[in-house]
Amino acid sequence: MINRMLVTPTAALSSLFALCALFSISADADDREKLLGNWKLVSVYAEDVQTKQRHNPYGDHPKGYIAFTSAARFFALITADGPKPPTVQEEQAAAFRSMSAYTGKFRLEGDKFITKVDVAWNQAWVDTEQTRFWRFEGDRLHIISAPVANPNVAGSLLVGYLVWERE
């Protein structure tokens, strides 16, 4: 007597969904491992969503680092490469505007990492979620921001493009 297993369409679909979820969890874990560590800024530019005009918000020689930790914490610091330390109030204000620094717990969702900001150079970012899209090209990590309001042009949106190399 031969025992045959009957597989209903519902059972087959449930198994397929479970298998897909397992591969998704495995892929997220692999991606998480690839992201972990310290990354040094190679390049950054911002592009206007409508006009496609590009500019360097941190100047021609920005400096920066990001870090993804195994405790799911993300750190970021980017500064413009200024000619000298600021000495007067106007220079200090300009220095503040030419940097970005924040940290928080991050999670991966496919090609996005989302950081729940708990400390930032700009208090307006605290308790927000910062969404970034990411991909690897060779040994380099490419991060693209979601569109954000252009602080210099009312009604305009910018997207940031950043390239990092492992430290």
Q: What are the residue ranges of the model-derived segments?
A:
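Lipid interaction determinants
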Residues: 10, 22-167
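Bacterial N-terminal signal peptides that target proteins for export
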Residues: 1-15
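Low-complexity, intrinsically disordered segments with a bias for serine/threonine
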Residues: 18-19
